[in-house]
Amino acid sequence: MALAANRLFAASPAASGPATAFDDETVPALARALAARAYAAPSTVLPAWLADISYDQYRDIRFRGDHALWHDDGLRFQAQFFHRGFLFKEGVTMHVVEGGRSRELPYRSADFEFGPSLHPSGDDAALGFAGFRLHAPLNRPDYFDELCVFLGASYFRAVAPGLAYGLSARGLALGSGDPGAEEFPRFSQFWLETPAASADHVVVHALLDSPSVAGAFRFDIRPGEVVAFDVDARLYPRKPLPNAGIAALTSMYEFDAGDRVGTDDFRPAVHDSDGLSLVNGAGEQVWRPLRNPAQVEHCG
């Protein structure tokens, strides 16, 4: 059923607008239709007070935790949202799904706190969101830790109990390592399925778009000692994709304690990840340490 008026709390963001039918084929149908049309680049226009802010100023825009989606519903999950600005100038459209019906989640400036270095001008109702993050009780039952983040292009990342963020995943990589410019498909819309009261997982749908391809993604996210993402991805190319990275991972590495050639830095290491650990199709465990070569290298 659609969200009922008596379930919408003033503090929490409330889905609005007409309810539309939604199921697992809704986003794939949108992606197919999108791929049949010419690509339309998203607007990056922002008001002056947001257009050229610094990293520190962007971090000074905080979503109010007590305004989180599902905050008052007694569920295992809550959702908070990121503001547009800094590197994240393109807006994304957020939807909430409940009972097979979807409604758009409107932007409200009252859901955010703006630090003293920022000077919002009016309500700016058309600003919209840049992304979102999910929270769940990972490390103790009475606190909602950050579980995962979807922010920027098709990037997403997650963190398990007692750990810190490392690498990020990407919905799709196009032209990584090629001599020419890399293409960055972006998630333009998200649908958050309202989980059942006893649910131990949450489902997110995303619509992907870029000059070369449209796509539909379904993420079944299950927290625990190991945080698991079951991902269903369907791609609808507008043109041939000669170098597409499926299930791509990305991280940051400058140097490590054993790889300091040409480095004059007091820090022992600077990286988010220092290697790739994987299990291949034969069941072998493989460890590949990262390095920072002078030229781009490809490893098969």
Regions found by a protein language model. Give the residues of each.
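Acidic, contiguous internal or C-terminal segments within carbohydrate-active enzymes
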Residues: 206-252
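A contiguous, surface-exposed recognition patch within enzymatic or periplasmic domains that forms
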Residues: 56, 149-151, 158-165, 242, ...
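Extended, loop-rich substrate-binding clefts of extracytoplasmic carbohydrate-active enzymes
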Residues: 166-222
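Extracellular structured ligand-interaction cores
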Residues: 55, 89-91, 129, 187, ...
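Solvent-exposed N-terminal domain segments of exported/luminal and surface proteins
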Residues: 32, 36-178
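Cleaved targeting-peptide boundary
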Residues: 11-22
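N-terminal export signals
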Residues: 1-13
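A short, structured loop/turn motif at beta-sheet edges
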Residues: 99-101, 194-198, 223-226, 238-239
